[in-house]
Design a protein with these regions (language model features):
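Exposed substrate/partner-binding surface patches
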Residues: 1-147
Length: 147
């Protein structure tokens, strides 16, 4: 099963124990303390850009498909602020990379105001099917908050 963009956010925000050499230094006690560190968001912006880390520790590109919803993406789970409920987004753009760490080619998929998706590839533009939008080459997702 391919991971989802939700899985990626879950991993990014997950708690991590800081201990030993990585322990947190408490200024009040002047000592290191073991603590859990995690990420929560107070509020999400009207435009949310999610960039996937597509490069492994060895410098090899990770071409695994990451499923991303096109409409009604709910990112409320990691919001801890005053506006927890209104975090529903629609995808309107995707950047793609073809190639490796030494070079490659970029394309963009963009949803026009007419509701249709288009691929921008250098000087060519073509209309796309929704089934083509998310691929193993997608690395940057542009979401717009629903009003």
């Amino acid at each position: 099963k391919s991971p989802s963009i939700y899985d990626c956010i879950e991993l990014y925000c997950s708690k991590e124990m800081l201990s030993g050499e990585n322990a947190w230094f408490n200024d009040k006690t002047n000592k290191k303390e073991d603590v859990n560190r995690g990420i929560l968001f107070w509020n999400l912006p009207s435009v949310l850009i999610i960039d996937l880390k597509r490069w492994g520790e060895t410098g090899r590109k990770i071409n695994k498909l990451v499923n991303a919803p096109l409409v009604d993406a709910d990112f409320s789970k990691h919001v801890n602020g005053y506006n927890k409920e209104n975090n529903i987004y629609d995808l309107y753009g995707v950047c793609n990379h073809y190639g490796g760490v030494q070079g490659g080619h970029y394309t963009a998929f963009v949803k026009n105001a007419n509701g249709k998706w288009y691929e921008f590839n250098d000087t060519s533009i073509r209309e796309m099917k929704e089934s083509e939008i998310v691929s193993s080459r997608s690395y940057c997702f542009f979401y717009r908050k629903k009003v």
